[in-house]
Swiss-Prot record:
This is Xaa-Pro dipeptidase. It catalyses: Xaa-L-Pro dipeptide + H2O = an L-alpha-amino acid + L-proline. It comes from Lactobacillus helveticus (Lactobacillus suntoryeus). The keyword Cytoplasm applies. GO terms for biological process: proteolysis.
Amino acid sequence: MNLDKLQQWLQDSNNDIAYISNPITISYFTGYSMDPHERIFALLVFKDANPFIFCPALNVEEAKNSEWNGDVFGYLDSEDPWELIADNVRKRTSDTHTWAIEKDDLSVAHYQYLRGEFPNASFTNDVSSFIERLRLYKTPEEIKKLQGAGAEADFAFKIGFDAIRTGVTERSIAGQIDYQLKIQKGVMHESFETIVQAGKNAANPHLGPTMNTVQPNELVLFDLGTMHDGYASDSSRTVAYGTPSDKQREIYEVDREAQQAAIEAAKPGITAEELDSVARDIITKAGYGEYFIHRLGHGIGKNVHEYPSIVQGNDLVLEEGMCFSIEPGIYIPGFAGVRIEDCGVVTKDGFKTFTHTDKDLKIIPIRD
């Protein structure tokens, strides 16, 4: 179990306690997910004692009925959560110990509260890099959930393509996608805001859907994903509404060639930066290198963006079980944008994608 690995890390690194404060990380180790809003939600793991979840009293029964089979302690809004955390820690270990914290997540205020309860403790060690490395390799169970999320993304593309017509807004198309995911697939949460971009808007990669309307002979870019049993999907497709121009076709085919070459190259032994270069070199040789303005890909898992980063300067050697996106893009301001994206997993036989929506340039007939 992953929790056993964390406890072993505590022993090997001479840490006594890990204070896990990121809700996604807590879910990774316990199977229990919640949004604490402004309240305290933490997992405390000890090198030589039983771990416990600490959460609002509102969520105690939910946590006890989840996959988690360990202790759960709660607090009322009228109580001091830090005193209660301290009481439960002291029942398990002494006052003088070394804590490992998630430095990228723990707020300064919460850190100060912990220091106030444990003035003789050390909080200098960071557990984040160990967790990042642990989450880098997906289990077969995790991959199955990622595949499920990918299937939902494929469904979403179909809904989006069918919704395109002259005069419809980007927001309307995005809304139809989100609605149909809920009523037909039972999706409760998208992994990020559904992006639909028509025409020149697609040259702004992270611009959300606007009230801009789709017009004939434009490219329409979709970037979307869902949360499936706690795991994310993230995929992009670009389609032509009406007759694409020669230049629209050209940038699409260059981007598609770059993505396919990277997918074929994503095998054990290649480094992250080498994989980025496979796609980037194709786009650059075609004359569009200045318009590929982001990394080739990012990790995928319980977060829609996580380690590893498929980017120049990252010499990480890719191995079996690593999951990430491959998403080259070409964005020409004032004209159009193209991005084709699939997430997948590195296997001994190559890169297996979680999404399967066709990548030939789809031409949607003009319709009112």
